[in-house]
């Protein structure tokens, strides 16, 4: 599906100056969800991306794999950047549904916010690490 490849290229080159082109790739009522956001509509999605660029420097989004089944694409990716002076990398997967017109109508990002984000925060991270150790199988190293 050429639309999936085009959206992939758009995401891999996403930058503040490319946000005006978002409407070429998503429907006006697009539904976007990730561990921090659940928004509907082009303007709401644009604000999510604007907020990301306001908060994160040196953003890099790389798609490692793209699979298609009809109107649904599954994308494995890596997102990296610098937040408050600290470099980070997130590994995740997206489920993307395309409308009959070939634009994205749903984009759901899945990634482990507990181990890839929250555990790096001073107070919450210690608490999550403690809880994880308490409920983990005793055979884990």
Where on the chain are the PLM-derived regions?
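Short, mixed-charge, low-aromatic patches
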Residues: 1-9, 32-35, 49-53, 138-140
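Bulky hydrophobic/aromatic packing residues
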Residues: 21-26, 36, 77, 109-111
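Generic detector of well-ordered alpha-helical segments enriched in charged/polar residues
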Residues: 8, 23, 46, 125-132
